[in-house]
Amino acid sequence: TTETVANLSERMVLPAPLCDTQFVIDGDKFLSQWGLAKTFTTDILSASSIDFQTTATQQRRENGNEQGAAEDALGGSAPATITFSAICTDAVEHKEWQISKSQDFSTVDYRFNEETIDYTFDEQGSYYVKFIGSNSDASCTNESDVYTVSIGESLLDCPNAFSPDASPGYNDEWKVSYKSIVEFKCWIFDRYGNKMIEFDDPSKGWDGKYKGKYVKPGVYYYVIEAKGADGKEYKKKGDINILRSTRTDRNETTE
């Protein structure tokens, strides 16, 4: 950058450079007209002052049956994966992300000597995250604002009825409603004990099909084993009522 100074005193105080910098002084404008201007060039000054900018970006899941966090909050439903990034100036030699369960960071649970980290929060509670940067001799140190990550208590609710292929897009798939479920297994059976489907992702569901065809209306049964981010264990059993459709062109399985 170039800066014009009208009146130069004996001393000029400049802010410490954020990157290795060389200063060049040209003057004065009257001597320049006669071709007698003088130029003074400093040695390259190594950066000692530091600066950085940080961001935190959560990987959002578009699961309609998951109760997550608000758009402007971090955390919500576990597992929550968040990318913490720092953009640093040249003089930042020592870089560290800290994660703590203590708001005052009296105890630091995790340290990462990287500019960018991906961290997955899979236990219920509040976490505090900050970035610390310093120059080579630690004579200049700075900290970022603290990011708060709140992981909520677990929740698992199961519906007892749905109507596959009756009204596309509305109650046509059986899904649990959940929050902060970190382990999940679900089996669905017919009344004879035949397994209709098995899945291990709570965001998934059952479309009412068996071997590619819709099953007949009636009562089916689910068994669920799950674990929440708060350590709560779930063992659920119940019935699923498939409601009869008025459609006559259904491609159903026969018993």
Where are these regions (language model features)?
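Accessible peptide chain termini
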Residues: 1-2, 206
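Short, compositionally biased serine/threonine- and acidic-rich segments at solvent-exposed termini, linkers
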Residues: 2-161, 179, 249
